[in-house]
Swiss-Prot record:
GO terms for molecular function: protein-membrane adaptor activity. The lineage of its organism: Eukaryota, Fungi, Dikarya, Ascomycota, Saccharomycotina. InterPro entries: ARM-like, ARM-type_fold, Armadillo, Vac8. It is a lipid-anchor. This is Vacuolar protein 8. Gene3D superfamilies: Leucine-rich Repeat Variant. Belongs to the beta-catenin family. Functions in both vacuole inheritance and protein targeting from the cytoplasm to vacuole. PROSITE patterns: ARM_REPEAT. A lipid is attached at residue 2 (N-myristoyl glycine). The gene is VAC8. It is found in: Vacuole membrane. PANTHER family: VACUOLAR PROTEIN 8 (PTHR47249:SF1).
Amino acid sequence: MGVCCSCFKRYEHDQSYPPLLAENEREAISSLLQYLENRSEVDFFTDGPLRALSTLVYSENIDLQRSAALAFAEVTEKDVRPVTRDVLEPILILLQSSDAEVQRAACAALGNLAVNDSNKVLIVNMGGLEPLIRQMMSPNIEVQCNAVGCITNLATQDQNKSKIATSGALIPLTKLAKSKDLRVQRNATGALLNMTHSLENRQELVNAGSVPILVQLLSSTDPDVQYYCTTALSNIAVDEGNRKKLASTEPKLISQLVQLMDSTSPRVQCQATLALRNLASDANYQLEIVRAGGLPNLVTLLNSTHQPLVLAAVACIRNISIHPLNEALIIDAGFLKPLVSLLDYNDNVEIQCHAVSTLRNLAASSERNRLALLESGAVEKCEKLVLNSPISVQSEISACFAILALADDLKMKLLDSNIIEVLLPLTSSENGEVCGNAAAALANLCSRIPDYTIILKNYEQISKFIAKFLNSQNPTFEHIALWTTLQLLESEDETIKAKLKKQINSGEISLNNLTTSTLNNHSDTSNIINNDGEEGEFNDGDDIINLTQQILEMIK
């Protein structure tokens, strides 16, 4: 506050000045000097101190305006709390000044107050955006820096974001993101990031031409700028339309993000990986990330001890693994071992789910991959984990089991691993997806196998699940039960066939209460793995009738 004090004392002792000052201005200076000497006990936002500061603000003397602006800047730096319109009004008046020193200090004061949420809303409601936008375009770097910093703070408040997006602020912010002054660049890219949290605001950002600048700044040497830009682009890539636009206009984006996965800054690594994850929602990007050399970096990140990095990496590889052409490349790049290790993340369900989902994707289309999965210990780990896991993890694991059970060459290996001992309890889950996928896996394991010894050993429980599913009034469950019944009747095991015929004929397994239509909506079974290895309802009522007729024919 020394600057302000010395300025005020100059007016008090220099006899050449008094004629230039009005009486109320002299009184204000005198009062402020007293307040400043006891500043720790003075509330500058009320009564006398605020009146004295306001008097200087409305003075025509530029030196007094500067002193008021500097006083507001220093007071607000040390005392940030909700303020009234009476406090903000003189600061906003100072913001209208053509003097760079007044502008700089007034922007600083407003930026300090804009740390408080209620102040953020009040500043915008009082028309603070328009003068701030003007000051952003000032030729003075200090004014630019403080004005952009204030906008950055204002943009963290949800109520302000759409107003800022449509205020005309985005174009000057985009220009200032290219500033040679690092402080201005950081503030501008931070403000742009704050505008990426809603679809409408992201669209305004795209329309303002911000995306090419954000991509260009990925090559910045400053970790803060890199972080703001990668995070902003990650948010922008959430929208399908934006991903398509990025694909056609930013050919270097993927290679730059892949490089940033190797950054020395963990938060830059994390955001670059999340940006790639969002882009990999599209098939073309799933392939491009692999072509750009992204797999080695992702393997490294999966082995990180920093949990946010692990989560970002496993979410990214999960999306990349969706593309069939990437499956073998991912396995050959050494992903299986770290993915299996991630199943031990009991304190992070999201990591577990992404890891299992990736393993499931890798098993989708290749016998070689499915065998590699089995040999990696993934199935054994899932069997140990599943019964004590949250529903979300059970859902992913049961879907993975259903996919693996489709492979004829793996069925006996799966049965030998005692998978049936976890599938049977899962068929009683209250979650339709979990019990449906477990039942689908069981059904597949009962189909076309050379040895039914394990099935026979567990026949009593298998028949109970069949009976329960046939009485469920759920067409998907009925279809699974009928198909399982048919596979058992078509087996070459006479003991199983005899037991099943007896139960059907006695009504213990009833075919008389089946649905013949799927008009009922069973949303919790829509993601069950069907006989083709895809998510979706099994079949309609016609197939239930056909399966029933085949079964009745076989038990005659």
